[in-house]
Amino acid sequence: MYKKIGIIYHPLNPAACDLAIKLTAKLDSLGIENWSDSAWQADKLTSKMQNTQLIFTTGGDGTILRTAHAILPLEIPILSVNLGKVGFMTELSPEDAISGLEKVLAGDGWIDERSLLEAEYLPHDSAQSRQFFVMNDAVVARGQVARVICVSVDINSQPFTTYKADGAIVSTATGSTGYSYAAGGPVLQPNSADIILTPILPHLGRGYSLVLPSDSTVDLQVNTWHEATLSIDGFINMQVSSGDTLRLRRSSKKVKFMRLRPNNYFYKELDTKLKGNNESVYDR
């Protein structure tokens, strides 16, 4: 029995806000403790997560990414409503939100576990390192000036290559349908723990993606006279300097999704979603 449920919504999507209100009213009518807040206030949600057993999201994949970061290192299941455009990670249509909630409360559903990466940012000047969880991808890329950068790659502490390119992407299986795919990377089955390494527009060569075993460690070192950036899951962004390193490895933590569809849903919907990948502004 669920005793406490959270609702996290996209604050700039009116439909997402309205649905959050309806879900709150439904939970109130059932006498279930609940709370709701904006996905853009994720850093302020820690205290609300205490004893929360399920998180309902109303938005798109971007809302889910922010929610996952807010939940971690806890592993509270996420039940998501697609009010974005593509919704690779979402579970329910807006029309099915209330009935989907009722089914889960009645004991239906199964847990879909997704692997994460842990990223450690190591500045070249020995300043304090920073740690991040990565659900989709970590991207080291050029800045606003249209100049290629060099990204040296080590795999398991052994030199692999240096990309002279717009950057490089390290992706999870969950993120394989995102930026990595757009850069020519493969699509992995979402429960895979493998890691994808993909260059972005490499100079003097087509480049190729590499699928690495789940126990791999990948180091990306920036070498450039120009501006460079680091982006984690598309919303944690910072400038980086020449000599800085990003170290990535698989995390022991998981992100858990509550599913109501059959467990072959990914293959049934993959082709349709990839062909119709026209993102809504509200999916960011």
Curated annotation (Swiss-Prot):
Q: Give the GO biological process terms.
A: NAD metabolic process; NADP biosynthetic process
The protein's name: NAD kinase
Fetch the Pfam families from UniProt. NAD_kinase (PF01513), NAD_kinase_C (PF20143)
Write out the similarity annotation.
Answer: Belongs to the NAD kinase family.
Q: Does the entry feature the keyword Cell membrane, yes or no?
A: no
Q: Which reaction does it catalyse?
A: NAD(+) + ATP = ADP + NADP(+) + H(+)
Organism (species)? Dehalococcoides mccartyi (strain CBDB1)
Q: Which InterPro entries match?
A: ATP-NAD_kinase_N, ATP-NAD_kinase_PpnK-typ_C, NAD/diacylglycerol_kinase_sf, NADK
Question: Which residues are involved in binding NAD(+)?
Answer: D61, G62, R66, N136, D137, R147, K164, D166, L201
UniProt function note: Involved in the regulation of the intracellular balance of NAD and NADP, and is a key enzyme in the biosynthesis of NADP. Catalyzes specifically the phosphorylation on 2'-hydroxyl of the adenosine moiety of NAD to yield NADP.
Where found? Cytoplasm
Q: Which UniProt keywords apply?
A: ATP-binding, Cytoplasm, Kinase, NAD, NADP, Nucleotide-binding, Transferase
Active site, per annotation: D61
Recorded superkingdom: Bacteria
Q: What is its main location?
A: cytoplasm
Q: What is its EC number?
A: 2.7.1.23
The protein's required cofactor(s) are namely: a divalent metal cation
